[in-house]
A protein has these predicted regions:
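N-terminal presequence-like segments and the immediate start of the first folded domain
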Residues: 4-8, 17-78, 82-91, 96-99, ...
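Repetitive helical segments and hydrophobic/amphipathic motifs
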Residues: 11-12
Length: 161
């Protein structure tokens, strides 16, 4: 049934997350979802919110989906950018620390403008590198999936000493 995967994807995009839950993995820190439901989903599929390796933060792809009855893509993108911000914060970074972004779109031409409008609300110049790619489908019926790479500001400052 298609409604359940959409609900799961939409729920994961808006579930609030608390402080970082770091686990050691060969010299890296792994951030898992704080909510039981989010953690179960991640454990079922074998992924985390983010991995911190040295001064680099790798966020897993985060799915933007329309809520039931919703037609405004900006609302979906606003939810996903807030989620991205919460993960970055848990990793010790902010939107200013994003260095690379890849977005996967089910309709890149229709989705790029509303996403860009929301993107600029959170990410200011100088902008990170960004690749937007068209795809046939996204897990759970999502409209866009966003993958982020960021640099931890303290680690960057430490490397200059």
């Amino acid at each position: 049934m298609r409604k359940l995967p959409v609900l799961i994807a939409a729920t994961l995009a808006i579930v609030p997350f608390g402080p970082a839950d770091a686990q050691t993995r060969s010299g890296t820190s792994v951030l898992m979802a704080e909510s039981e439901r989010g953690r179960q989903f991640q454990e079922e599929y074998g992924f985390s919110d983010a991995v911190i390796a040295g001064d680099t933060i790798y966020l897993s792809g985060i799915v933007a989906g329309l809520a039931p009855g919703e037609t405004d893509m900006k609302a979906a993108y606003d939810r996903v950018y807030r989620h991205i911000g919460s993960i970055l914060k848990r990793a010790g970074a902010s939107y200013d620390d994003i260095v690379d972004m890849t977005s996967f779109h089910t309709d890149v031409e229709a989705q790029l403008k509303p996403m860009s409008q929301v993107h600029k609300k959170y990410v200011t110049a100088p902008y990170p590198a960004w690749s937007a790619i068209g795809v046939a489908r996204i897990l759970g019926g999502g409209i866009t999936e966003i993958k982020i790479t960021a640099r931890r500001p303290q680690a960057a400052a430490d490397s200059r000493l």
